[in-house]
UniProtKB/Swiss-Prot annotation:
Belongs to the GTP cyclohydrolase I family. This is GTP cyclohydrolase 1. It comes from Synechococcus sp. (strain JA-3-3Ab). It catalyses: GTP + H2O = 7,8-dihydroneopterin 3'-triphosphate + formate + H(+). Coiled coil: none annotated. GO terms for cellular component: cytoplasm. GO terms for molecular function: GTP binding; GTP cyclohydrolase I activity; zinc ion binding. Toroid-shaped homodecamer, composed of two pentamers of five dimers. Its EC number is 3.5.4.16. InterPro entries: GTP-CH-I_C/QueF, GTP-CH-I_N, GTP_CycHdrlase_I, GTP_CycHdrlase_I_CS, GTP_CycHdrlase_I_dom. One of its GO terms (biological process) is tetrahydrofolate biosynthetic process. The gene is folE. Pathway: Cofactor biosynthesis; 7,8-dihydroneopterin triphosphate biosynthesis; 7,8-dihydroneopterin triphosphate from GTP: step 1/1. It comes from the Bacteria.
Length: 229
């Protein structure tokens, strides 16, 4: 089999959780800190809606610290939902190769962040994606980009997991696909039950990953195995 680790390869230990949160903060800061490219690139109705929200919570959108906040929020949302403006075909761009390979290919520990569609709060975590090719393989970076494309939409974790698996099945027609996502949801940390440290695990097993217990167990064992790198 082929095992690829785009990041540290470590499992979810405390330091890894801190790294995930740091990554999210950097990405959100980058998005929110972007100055609008021009008023024509932002939807005035969205900008006005943010101003209305600010007034609704008792703030003054015209005070010094908030003058550009509506534009920044809209720019951030455009970045965080950029997956709506991407397609699977354009993303893959022909990077499928006939290698005659028929053993498991696994890309694990793919960092992801997304927005919960119920509260528009982030959830962050990692995806582990495996498939058994029917001779054809896809460039490894494309798997990470598929995760990113579907993550950058309003999501629930269950659907995100399924969409990643379905995309690989559609694109490669492999013998099977396995996807596991482990994530922490800010809607459970910052509000509601307020339970920091809780993690949600979802899976989507298709083809031999669903039908063959040995294939499924091999996949699950590999994503649990700590990296020695």
């Amino acid at each position: 089999m082929t095992l690829a680790k785009p990041g540290s390869g470590a499992e979810f230990r405390l330091n890894n959780k801190a790294n995930l949160k740091s990554r999210l903060v950097r990405d959100l800061s980058h998005a929110a800190g972007q100055e609008p490219e021009g008023s024509e690139s932002l939807d005035p109705a969205m900008v006005a809606a943010v101003e209305t929200l600010l007034r609704g919570i008792g703030e003054d959108p015209q005070r010094e610290g908030l003058k550009k906040t509506p534009e920044r929020v809209v720019a951030a949302l455009k970045f965080l939902t950029s997956g709506y403006r991407q397609s699977l075909e354009d993303l893959i761009n022909g990077a499928i190769f006939d290698e005659g390979h028929d053993e498991m290919v696994l890309l694990r520990d793919i960092t992801l962040f997304s927005l919960c569609e119920h509260h528009l709060l982030p959830f962050i975590g990692k995806a582990h994606v495996a498939y058994i090719p029917r001779q054809k393989v896809v460039g490894l970076s494309k798997i990470a980009r598929i995760v990113e494309m579907y993550s950058r939409r309003l999501q629930v974790q269950e659907r995100l997991t399924r969409q990643i698996a379905e995309a690989l099945m559609t694109m490669l027609d492999p013998y099977g696909v396995g996807v596991v996502i482990e994530a922490t949801h800010m809607c459970m940390v910052m509000r509601g039950v307020q339970k920091p440290g809780s993690w949600t695990v979802t899976s989507s097993m298709v083809g031999v990953f669903q039908e063959d217990p040995r294939t499924r167990e091999e996949f699950l064992s590999l994503i649990r195995h700590p990296s020695n790198l």
